[in-house]
Amino acid sequence: MWCDTIPFMHDSHVHLTREPLISNLSEIIHSFQDKGGTYILSQSTQSDDFDTNLQLTTLYPAVIQAAIGLHPTIFEDISTKNTYEQKDIFIKGEREIKLFEKYVQKHNNKIKAIGECGLDYYQFSLNESYSKETKEELKEIQKISFRKHLQLALKFNLPLSIHVRDVADSDECVRDVIRLICEEGKGALCGVFHSYTGNMSYLEEILDLGFYIGFNGIITYKSGENVRDILKQTPFDRILFETDGPFLPPQSVRKNGHIKEKFAQPADIKEIIETASQVKNITYEYLEKSSDANYSLLFL
């Protein structure tokens, strides 16, 4: 039984190749271990960081595991100065997708997950210069990319780390993610919806598909009531913890005037679990052990 095992605190979603984490990696890892941490799943977001991310697993083989994937928002970045022609979006986007596919095929035995991947309709909505046509093209290339991630996850029996972010008062993005999962491999795919902040009404459907939910520093924010509500409704056997570092530092870091550079790191998992245990009205020890067991089932 998992309740008899020794806890091994995990960070199921962090970007160790990003600054300032990568430049302070030794200190970051030691701080995590000092707080009882054992496993870190480091996420890729674009082809430029694939090699670096995989190399980290050889530097700290007992601690760091690698997820390889393309973040959906990179398709805005691949065209210079956010100036688009249709051919640029699809030619450059599909080139990046092919690089990802070849990399996973070559290194799948060293990879623990496919990610970070998914759909994001929020980010490009902020750019008022985009035409409706451009926005639809960005949605389409994101879907093409996500399908490829799902297909490779099936082919190599790897879990997914899924990003989904909707425009306010919309559920189009999460509906598309769920639809694509069902079309490509309902019942055969597994993974985690990382940092899910979407509509609560889709939680049951996500869980029914066999996926987990990743919770991070947002649950410590005053503005995180929606995510705390999602946590309350998520069963213990589907909860994972993450930092999404260097993004989303917990409240204690955000409000600390003595900390000049505010970022999230794996050691912050302890504070996140402490907050989650209060939300779930359960002991820290129980929640840590149950979530560690979930990590083990999915990624080890």
Where are each of the predicted segments found?
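Mid-domain alpha/beta scaffold segments of enzyme catalytic cores
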Residues: 1-300
